[in-house]
Amino acid sequence: MIHRKASLKGLSRFFLLLACAALFTGCATQSPTASGGPGSSANPAATTDKKDLKDVRVQLSFLMQSLDAPLIVAINKGYFAEEGLNVSFERGFGNADTISKLGTGKFDMAFSDMYNALEFNEKNPNDKVIAVAVTQNKAPFAVLSLKERGISSPKDLNGKKLGAPAGDGPRKLFPLFAQEVGVDPKSIEWTTMEPKLRETFLLQGKVDAISGFSTSAIPSLLKAGKKPEDITTFYYTENGLDFYGNTILVKDSFAKANPEVVKAFVKAYFRGMQDVIKDPTAGLDAVIAADQSKLMDRQAEKVRLDIALKSMYVTPEVEKNGFGAADTARLQETIDQTVAGFGLKSKPQVADIFSDQFLPPKEQRQVPPAAERKPLS
């Protein structure tokens, strides 16, 4: 009898273990909680079997930064999955390189500017790329100096030494900027360096000013110990060159073959953008969490995102037309300026580089009301 009781007790324990194992397995198959990393989401749509989703390969313009918050948020919250897409991304190595790789078909979509794309299209007419949405309404093209250099207006650049990498977009457009502000471009002595050394050359006094993106240069200068009031910034957009910033680019042949995929991507991306505008701190935190290297400087990324929020993402034009759109007259003027600045032989029109047919209805890409926008902290 004692042995029978012992065996029954053993069976009870066995079935109890089986029940626990089944319970544990059931719990393990539930939707993951949002952790801020790519692919994680509190949205059940994000857990859709990837076999049912269309893979979309995306390249960034450079290293992942806080400017990529709309993309990361849209991934995390399952917005792309809801549209039937499985989005993966890789870092870029500069706008021109990103466009080149897009043109070869290595990626399906990319974040870069239309102006370098114009130059690429002229050289590669059979691999043409087009912009399907504007993500930055104002370009961060700028010439930057330090107050200690005594350059207080653009005209003070006459006869100075400027520095930038050879392929830098703002450097290539500098003659147009010079024409607008009354600087003789022939009086400028250019020093060429690697992109990572640009701010170092300025800090060390090897150059009087640099050309580049304010979103890259200003965070680097602040990280090096400079204060905002120490930095002088001359934006091209404030000096006669009203360029758009980065866009969502696709290969023209891909867009024609996959119009619904492009539309789905753009729609989900701007849902992410709307969330970032509403809560930029959450967007910043999502990017920091997605950084697998864990080397990202949160303060520098905060500065970068703050610049974008104040002057690139939301402008009077975006408030009027919604995210993603482009003003035809403004864009054509900047295309013409690019043709002159880059020395292009062709004379492209807006339709040759930008299409709004992939944008969602205007009501789906409106700027959130000011009352719904939290400050960046």
Predicted features along the sequence, with ranges:
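Short, glycine-/small- and polar/acidic-enriched structural segments
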Residues: 33-194, 199-204, 208-215, 234, ...
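Short helix-capping segments at alpha-helix termini
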Residues: 79-83, 180-185, 224-227, 293-297, ...
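Short linear loop/turn motifs
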Residues: 88, 96, 192, 235-236, ...
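Surface-exposed patches in mature extracellular/periplasmic domains of secreted proteins
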Residues: 90, 129-131, 190, 276-286, ...
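Pocket-lining segment of extracytoplasmic ligand-binding domains
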Residues: 116, 197-200, 206-296
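Secondary-structure end/capping motifs
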Residues: 257-343
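Conserved C-terminal helix/tail region of periplasmic/extracytoplasmic solute-binding proteins
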Residues: 328-377
